[in-house]
């Protein structure tokens, strides 16, 4: 799916699960690497700070081109992936799977109904009473934090194994953290907090009905989740330390993520975290 160059590969010395190798796309404007590779790796590790299960990501190089490899979320040949559009269509026969853009039927409420008989992922440390939707609401909370705009209905899935159905770990997070911006614009936003705030407030998901802002979308999902899980995700977000965030971002080499980009991502995460916490407590 998608237009990115990618192939399934095996990595010797690791387990038998395949890895999806995805080349970082080049910017049409000047041929520079767009940054999806560092964004996907960074989001994978940020997700771990709040307990979101994700596909394992490793940096890679193919014939001199930057890339990442993403480990399959399927554990063996007895498991299959049923993507969100199929899950929603099974619950709602009139659901339009062909829409490439805003889908009025794609809402948190519809997803909650579609996941009613689905178990949460096995990769977890959350309380045992979490439902699959409670975890999925956590995915949207993470999206809002990292400015992830690509949670379309094929960008989440259910793992099928015999009669068992479980929500898959989150995957495909390259469209996040302002990866597409140039350093010149990042610096302007760092110099002008109001400019940066306008930028983050424009962040929206164009696939859900109504094309909601990312923070509003997260609030909507959290509002439909059980109270315990809702508090769990917000508490996890609230307890993240600046040192933990810096540790993740500092691990990206400066040859890949410039100092300006590093500071921009740190500031972006701090602002979105505050918007989520302050906005929800005041709603």
Tell what function each PLM region has.
Residues 73-140, 250-251, 255:
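ATP-dependent phospho-/nucleotidyl transfer catalytic cores
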Residues 108-182:
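Conserved kinase catalytic-core segment
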Residues 57-64, 152-161, 282-283:
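Short alpha-helical "patches" and their helix-cap loops
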Residues 35, 58, 128, 148-150, ...:
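Short, surface-exposed helix-loop/turn micro-motifs enriched in polar/charged residues
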Residues 35, 161-283:
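C-terminal catalytic region of ATP-dependent kinase domains
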Residues 41, 64-67, 134, 139, ...:
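Non-catalytic, well-ordered alpha-helical scaffold segments
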């Amino acid at each position: 799916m998608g237009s990115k160059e990618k192939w399934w590969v095996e990595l010797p010395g690791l387990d038998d699960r395949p890895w999806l190798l995805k080349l970082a796309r080049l910017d049409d404007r000047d041929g520079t690497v767009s940054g999806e590779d560092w964004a996907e790796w960074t989001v994978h590790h940020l997700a771990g700070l709040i307990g979101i299960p994700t596909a394992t990501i490793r940096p890679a190089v193919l014939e001199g081109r930057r890339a990442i490899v993403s480990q399959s979320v399927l554990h063996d040949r007895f498991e299959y992936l049923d993507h969100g559009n199929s899950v929603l269509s099974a619950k709602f026969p009139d659901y339009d799977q062909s829409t490439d853009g805003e889908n009025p039927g794609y809402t948190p409420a519809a997803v909650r109904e579609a996941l009613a008989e689905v178990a949460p992922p096995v990769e977890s440390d959350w309380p045992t009473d979490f439902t699959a939707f409670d975890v999925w609401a956590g995915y949207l909370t993470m999206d809002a934090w990292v400015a992830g705009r690509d949670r379309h209905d094929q960008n989440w899935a259910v793992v099928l194994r015999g009669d068992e159905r479980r929500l898959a770990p989150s995957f495909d997070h390259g469209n996040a953290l302002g990866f597409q911006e140039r350093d010149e614009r990042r610096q302007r936003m760092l110099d002008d907090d109001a400019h940066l705030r306008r930028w983050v407030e424009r962040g929206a998901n164009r696939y859900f009905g109504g094309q909601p802002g990312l923070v509003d979308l997260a609030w909507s999902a959290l509002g439909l989740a059980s109270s315990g899980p809702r508090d769990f995700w917000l508490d996890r977000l609230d307890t993240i330390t600046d040192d933990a965030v810096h540790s993740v971002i500092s691990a990206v080499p400066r040859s890949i993520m410039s100092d300006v980009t590093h500071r921009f991502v740190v500031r972006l995460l701090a602002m979105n975290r505050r918007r989520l916490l302050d906005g929800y407590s005041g709603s």
